[in-house]
Design a protein with these regions (language model features):
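Compositionally biased, intrinsically disordered or flexible polar/acidic segments
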Residues: 375-546
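Active-site-proximal substrate-binding groove within the catalytic cores of carbohydrate-active enzymes
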Residues: 73-99, 105-374
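Single conserved hydrophobic/aromatic residue that forms the stacking wall/gate
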Residues: 2-9, 13
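Hydrophobic beta-strand scaffold residues
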Residues: 16, 23, 140-141
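Acidic (Asp/Glu)-rich catalytic clusters
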Residues: 14-20, 93
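An acidic- and aromatic-residue-enriched active-site/binding cleft used to recognize and process polar
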Residues: 21, 26-32, 38, 105-110, ...
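Short acidic-hydrophobic catalytic motif
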Residues: 1, 34-38, 432
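Active-site-adjacent "subsite" loops/lids of carbohydrate-active enzymes
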Residues: 29-91
Length: 546
């Protein structure tokens, strides 16, 4: 159901470009209402949840209308789910441009006792709908709540209360699989009290809830929330999480890649540092806007601030900057100062309360709306095959152009560059005799070693055109390792290929056709209701002609 006409939705999508943004569309496939034109069909085909006595299962009353629950299993089996998806995409084709569809209130799938349909059956039907969206239209399902049963099926990158509903340790879930924002109950800027039990929201990055009546009449609040929460949330959740520590009563320290540290100090203030320089203190921020195709800083202070901010290392050598703010109706920028000199990669700023300042190198064309996603790709990658037959006996099949057998020997092609980010090397057995263990380069010995991390790690590879790159994975300790292997374009951050791995106690090779510079991202992943697998592992990388 939806309260927006298709014509209105299309108008919103057309206007989004004016504001340099993309809109997502929210639908609720779980609720049914008697005033819907589809009501009679759903009753006739028996597509609604029923109690054991045959009566309809009621939901809440929304906008003075009684809701009822859709039997997702019967709907799918009747072919109606696909029909609804097809009709919706035809009605609002611009959803394909955004690439995501948001299921509202994704917790409402009760059992239908009359039909002997369990809640687990309902969840399976949702997974089928998600798979259909992905395979048929290339659209990723996203959702309002984090449900462990849908982990990995429904992407949760914008889930506003993901920590509360998933109730897990953030160090166990990568931000590109699940992260999110907050509600208004723990932030004094919403008029509420800070809930110290939720301070991790800001340490890990919390976005903004733009629902209901919070901001509808005051766009300045939107600018405020985006500046000191969403920009930081976006910045933090593109980094690798390396270490999480607590201390004393309030202290939290999160160490991330790129020499970034996010801290909640004992003075009850959140601070963010990169290379030891302050980027955020409370509600004052000086953070990079990294998705645009030029250097840019967003500076903002809720109550006003005067002092020195240090530019990121990428700004070294820049001598002058231009400073902008938003115009009155937030449709563009207004120049505040042109050609301000800076010294020693730092700037003295006098920040007015509640006014964003956008700082760029002098002469930057601010009408250029290109982003990093419009950059030329750094490389290409396609999945070739999965090999579960070779085990550790790689010599006759892999590594003709080069290899790196972790903890043992490395011989790289002359044109290859290889580096590892966010992991550590562990040699488990240097004298193994098991077939799953990798053969040593010389002799008959075998080795069991892995590069591993608590959550995720990167292998950065640059190769010449048409190179076959194969990674070897083995769950040597048989600890239920489950991981997802993504291949990422370094320039645009787009995903080029992806593969889910589990049950690889006997060893498995994943081979990809690669050209240029790509990153293999290996992430701890969960199947079967958050089954607590062991840490991600990788044991070798091989190079051959494609």
């Amino acid at each position: 159901s939806t309260l927006m006409r298709s014509s209105a939705a299309s108008d919103v999508y057309k206007r989004q470009k004016k504001y340099n943004t993309n809109c997502t569309f929210h639908v609720n496939p779980f609720d049914a209402y008697m005033d819907s034109p589809m009501w009679d069909m759903y009753v006739k085909k028996d597509l609604l949840c029923r109690n054991a006595d045959g009566s309809l299962v009621k939901g809440d009353v929304w906008w003075n209308r009684q809701s009822y629950f859709v039997n997702m299993v019967n709907e799918w089996n009747a072919g109606v789910t696909k029909q609804r998806i097809d009709a919706f995409i035809e009605q609002v084709p611009l959803v394909k441009e955004t690439g995501v569809l948001y299921f509202d209130n994704e917790t409402q799938y009760p059992p239908s006792l009359y039909h002997y349909v369990t809640k687990e059956d309902q969840i399976s039907a949702i997974k089928k709908a998600a798979e259909y969206l992905k395979t048929e239209y290339g659209i990723q399902l996203i959702g309002e709540y984090a449900d462990t049963n849908l982990y990995g099926v429904c992407s949760l990158g914008v889930t506003w209360d993901w920590w509360a509903s998933l109730n897990i340790n953030q160090m166990e879930v990568a931000p590109y699989i699940a992260c999110g924002g907050r509600d208004g109950t723990h932030d004094e800027l919403y008029g509420g009290q800070i809930d110290l039990t939720k301070r991790r929201f800001q340490v890990f990055g919390a976005s903004v809830q733009l629902e209901d009546t919070q901001f509808q009449r005051d766009p300045f609040k939107v600018a405020r929330e985006l500046s000191h929460h969403t920009y930081v949330y976006f910045y933090l959740n593109r980094l690798l999480r390396l270490k999480y520590e607590t201390r004393d009563t309030l202290g939290i320290t999160l160490t991330l890649s790129d020499n970034v540290v996010s801290k909640w100090d004992n003075d009850n203030v959140h601070r963010l540092y990169r290379d030891g320089y302050l980027m955020k203190e409370g509600h004052d921020v000086f953070v990079p806007v990294f998705w645009v195709n030029h250097l840019e800083i967003m500076a903002y202070s809720v109550k006003g601030r005067t002092g020195i901010w240090h530019f990121p290392r990428e700004w070294t050598g820049i001598e002058k900057v231009d400073i902008y703010t938003f115009n009155e109706d937030f449709t563009g920028l207004r120049l505040l100062e042109q050609g301000r000199k800076i010294n020693k990669n730092q700037i003295y700023l006098s920040q007015e309360p509640d006014r964003a300042q956008i700082i760029v190198p002098a002469g930057t064309d601010m009408t250029d709306r290109s982003t990093i996603y419009s950059n030329p790709p750094s490389g290409t990658a396609t999945f070739i095959c999965k090999d579960v037959e070779t085990h550790g006996n790689w010599k006759r099949k892999y590594g003709k152009k080069g290899y790196d057998i972790f903890g043992h020997s490395s011989k790289l092609p002359k044109t290859c560059m290889l580096s590892y980010i966010g992991d550590s090397l562990k040699v488990l057995d240097n004298n193994s005799t098991r077939p799953v263990s990798l053969q040593k380069v010389e002799g008959k010995g075998r080795i069991e070693a892995v590069r591993t991390s608590v959550l995720h790690q990167l292998i950065d590879v640059t190769v010449e055109e048409n190179t076959k790159v194969s990674l070897y994975f083995a769950d040597y300790k048989e600890k239920n390792c489950q991981e997802v292997v993504d291949v990422i374009d370094v320039n645009t951050k787009r995903m080029l290929a992806s593969y889910l791995l589990n049950n690889f106690e006997e060893g498995v090779y994943l081979s990809f056709g690669v050209s240029g510079n790509v990153q293999f991202r290996i992430t701890r992943f969960f199947y079967d209701h958050y089954g607590n697998p062991d840490y991600p592992v990788c044991s070798a990388i091989f190079f051959d002609k494609e």
